[in-house]
From Swiss-Prot:
Originating gene: rplC
PANTHER family: 50S RIBOSOMAL PROTEIN L3, LARGE RIBOSOMAL SUBUNIT PROTEIN UL3C
Region (Disordered): 113-155
InterPro entries membership: Ribosomal_uL3 (IPR000597), Ribosomal_uL3_bac/org-type (IPR019927), Ribosomal_uL3_CS (IPR019926), Transl_B-barrel_sf (IPR009000)
Function: One of the primary rRNA binding proteins, it binds directly near the 3'-end of the 23S rRNA, where it nucleates assembly of the 50S subunit.
Family: Belongs to the universal ribosomal protein uL3 family.
Subunit structure: Part of the 50S ribosomal subunit. Forms a cluster with proteins L14 and L19.
GO molecular function: rRNA binding; structural constituent of ribosome
Protein name per UniProt: Large ribosomal subunit protein uL3
Record flagged with keyword Ribonucleoprotein: yes
């Protein structure tokens, strides 16, 4: 069954394994999450657990948010996300989910929001090749032909535009270390997002098969 936690990307560092191998890791701070709601098929049409992360100031919370938090006997949260495919009997409204949910060696999927790069051209945005630089060439970084038949730009054509700020999931990363007293997970490799951005860590369904 799926297990997961919400956290914050702190940055990257490197640690040594017991065998003396240097491993680059991403540090994720995941203070205890609060179970805000347990959704069932009878009441909601599907099964899920709703987790809340990071307290939100009362003055910034509206009445529905405060009422939702009161049911879980907690304060309003900045980030609320749902986990599906979980064992509902393991969760109770108002209980906490900590980093000890995971252990070293677990394989996880990490979801975050990619860093924004503003308005970019085809070469940076879609990794296309440059045009010739010499011999009278008049195209170097332009998108190129839009097509010669249909007198319009076909849907899905790779063109310049806004790059980044998309939801990205990297699968099958390994939990290298769990520091329970500091609410920290160290995950091998890099994860999407800028520093201090919200991260969702879930157990990998593919790895368990």
């Amino acid at each position: 069954m799926t297990k997961g936690i919400l956290g914050r990307k702190v940055g990257m560092t490197q640690i040594f394994t017991k065998d003396g191998v240097l491993v680059p890791v991403t540090v994720i701070e995941a203070t205890p999450n609060v179970v805000m709601q347990v959704k069932t098929v009878e009441n909601d049409g599907y099964e899920a657990v709703q987790l809340g992360y990071q307290d939100k100031r009362e003055v910034l919370s509206n009445k529905p948010e405060k009422g939702h938090a009161d049911k879980a006997k907690t304060s309003p949260k900045r980030f609320i996300r749902e986990l599906r495919g979980v064992e509902l009997s393991d969760y109770e409204v108002g209980s906490e989910v900590t980093v000890e949910t995971f252990k070293e060696g677990d394989v996880v999927n990490v979801t975050g929001t990619s860093r924004g790069h503003g308005y970019q051209g085809n070469i940076k945005r879609h990794h296309q090749s440059r045009g010739p630089e010499t011999h009278g060439s008049r195209y170097h970084r332009i998108p190129g032909s839009m097509g010669s038949i249909i007198n319009r730009v076909p849907k899905g054509k790779k063109l310049p535009g806004h790059m980044g700020v998309k939801t990205v999931t990297i699968e099958n990363l390994v939990v290298e270390k769990v520091v329970a007293d500091k609410n920290v997970l160290m995950i091998k490799g890099n994860v999407p997002g800028a520093k201090n951005s919200l991260i969702v860590v879930k157990s990998s369904a593919k790895a368990s098969k």
